[in-house]
Regions:
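Short, glycine-/aromatic-enriched active-site segment of Class I SAM-dependent methyltransferases
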Residues: 133-136, 159-173
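Short alpha-helix
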Residues: 172-194
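Short hydrophobic/aromatic beta-strand or adjacent loop that forms the aromatic wall/cage
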Residues: 178, 202-208
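Conserved SAM-binding loop
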Residues: 25-26, 32-127, 210-211
Length: 212
């Protein structure tokens, strides 16, 4: 199996396991109203029973949302929905992308406002492999060190086939906007939520803030 194929298989494995755990946690049925912030339809194809789904994403993601039954262009920090509009708000690896601490706080407040329950997953900052770049330890370096290194040395560029423009955008976004979280920071953002761990080889790979 080629490295890129192996990476794709592993990604689908973790995604399927996460979606099944989410569905069990909330008892998802065809009647459950779910808002997926930053998502695409492919995750939901992994569930045997799909909810009443609304996808919210940026206009840039329009091509990835082809075929989605209901999607809205918007910003997770300012959601265009009334309080309690959804049974569950779902977010998979999004909160670390919204910007600085103040932006993450706005995102967290909006999630808690429009969802009666929520599931917010994010990579663990203390997992030794940076999960966007698939590169060990680089996220523990100061940003001033990362800037000259990341564009040249990262595993992601070898495993994922994208256009040069998409690659440049992704790297710049990572360097400028991505802010990884640890357990204490996620708890502070969602003080009334339970925080659970997703482990890989005994190490906490990701964190989930969960409120039923």
């Amino acid at each position: 199996m080629a490295a890129g194929d192996w990476f794709g298989w592993m990604s689908r494995h973790f995604r399927r396991r996460r979606m099944q755990r989410f569905a069990r946690a909330f008892g998802i049925t065809a009647a459950t109203r779910v808002l997926d912030i930053g998502g695409t339809p492919d995750c939901w194809e992994l569930l045997a029973e799909r909810p009443r789904l609304t996808l919210l994403n940026t206009p840039r993601a329009r091509a990835d949302l082809a075929g989605a039954a209901a999607w809205v262009a918007g910003d997770g920090r300012c959601l265009p929905f009334r309080d309690g509009a959804f049974d569950v708000v779902f977010s998979n690896s999004v909160i670390e992308h919204v910007g600085d601490r103040a932006s993450q706080e706005r995102f967290a407040r909006e999630v808690a406002r429009v969802g009666r329950g929520f599931w917010v997953q994010t990579p663990n900052r203390w997992f030794p492999v940076e999960q966007h770049l698939l590169t060990p330890f680089i996220h523990w370096m100061p940003k001033s060190w990362q800037r000259p290194i990341v564009p040249r040395i990262n595993v992601w560029r070898w495993l994922v086939r994208v256009t040069p423009d998409r690659r440049r955008f992704y790297i710049e976004h990572y360097l400028n906007d991505v802010r990884l979280l640890d357990m204490s920071e996620l708890r502070a953002l969602f003080p009334r939520a339970q925080v659970i761990r997703e482990r890989f080889l005994g190490v906490t790979k990701s964190l989930v803030a969960l409120r039923r």
